[in-house]
Amino acid sequence: MPNIEADRVTSVPENNDCKSKSQPLRNNLHETVKSYSIQGAATANIEPPAERPYPWGCPVTHTKEKFYTICADYAFLNQATSLCKSSSSVCSSSSEDKSALSNTINYIDLQTSESDSVYNEDASLESLSSNLGTRPLAWEIDKSDFSTMTSKLKRSGVKKQTPKKKPDRKAKPLRDCPQHLILDDVKQRKVLDLRRWYCISRPQYKTSCGISSLVSCWNFLYSTLGAGSLPPITQEEALHILGFQPPFEEIRFGPFTGNTTLMRWFRQINDHFHVKGCSYVLYKPHGKNKTAGETAVGALSKLTQGLKEDSTAYVYHCQNHYFCPIGFEATPVKASKAYRGQLFPHEVEYWILIGEPSRKHPTIHCKKWADIVTDLNTQNPEYFDIRHTERGLQYRKTKKGGNLHCLLAFQRLSWQRFGPWPLQLGTLRPEPQPPVQGRRIPKSESEDNVSKKQHGRLGRSFSAGFQQELAWKRMCNIRERRGSGSPESDTDYEGND
């Protein structure tokens, strides 16, 4: 940019040489300024007068320089001033160009001396402010847009915060609910009777998971360790009652231990201790003795209801193993319903707590009911190991179809359900007895364990039939120990605990 201040000395009329040299310089400056003035709109016709030593457009250079200088000095005031000094003729020509300029930029003409010299750059800012007086500065910043934006941001921020307060409003009824109601609701969804865990016979023998699980159920139903009144029994006592002899570590229980075998052993132990009970298959969707018509939803309802009571115990037959369900938890799907009560079935996910008799596994398993249903509904040659769900579906060498896995239920029966048995047996004495040759003893009658005194009251015929039934049971046990076994366990049990 040309420096106009350096050429002020050319205005001295005494130096003719300098005046002759400055004349062509003025013409060049005029041509340059003319190009700036007519750029964008040809609104003014500027001709170079002879008496005009410097063009009016030269202060544009100072305007750009002064703009940044004054902005730095008045930064805290958010104001800036563009200064220039021009003649009256230039003011008239510049007034015509104001329509083409922006409304935010205004030029202020300063009345100083009559000489056409540019405002002195070394003048102090204090003298500048005194000359301006009360006139507004040329450069002002409009903050209205910023204020509207900040107000919009505040409003939008308030709108975003309103949804966060909605969960608090919904949570108010939970706070107002009595504490005992919340406790009762949680108890219905989280069930674990510690007595069932106390009765788990752990550890087991190498392959005695079947009899160990059965002893666990029996102790819970009939012993003082659980919900009964009899002394608890051990695995060794139960094996002795069933006719097994030590050493028990050498017995291979796998080949002759099946679902029906456990139910028969349960009846024999009950007969030995003169207690009443029954056993049945709760849920077995495929294979022999399947529960036709039973669904997974119905089986889950019966299982959870039975675990809340103390009159029923369960055994779960899974891949090469038996163990006992002892509790459950109905976990809500949504976190906001952790302490809600009376949830719908689709709002919860059931987990079954299973006691483990083997010391090689955790003492309590927690398995999804959906995984248990998958295990029970898988048919050969596919199988699903519930204790190793990470392995997924696996295959074994066996014939297609069927599945031995199931849920077994063992229930304690009270004497009152069958009436006063001692009085009923006493009234049977005067009744005439049919001859021994023509009378057949029903199976249900032979399974009821009656004391020796009651046998004498019933007569010699009943006593003889009862002894025949016991002899038949012993023969069955001997055959099972020789390896004939249960047909259910031949293709399932591999000798692992």
UniProtKB/Swiss-Prot annotation:
Organism: Xenopus laevis
Principal location class: cytoplasm
Region (Disordered), start-end ranges: 1-24, 150-173, 426-462, 478-497
Ranges of compositional bias, category Basic and acidic residues: 442-451
Compartment annotation: Cytoplasm; Nucleus
Molecular function terms, GO-annotated: DNA endonuclease activity; single-stranded DNA binding
Family the entry assigns: Belongs to the BIVM family.
Protein name, entry field: Basic immunoglobulin-like variable motif-containing protein
Start-end of Basic residues biased regions: 152-169
Keyword terms: Cytoplasm, Nucleus
A single Gene Ontology CC term: cytoplasm
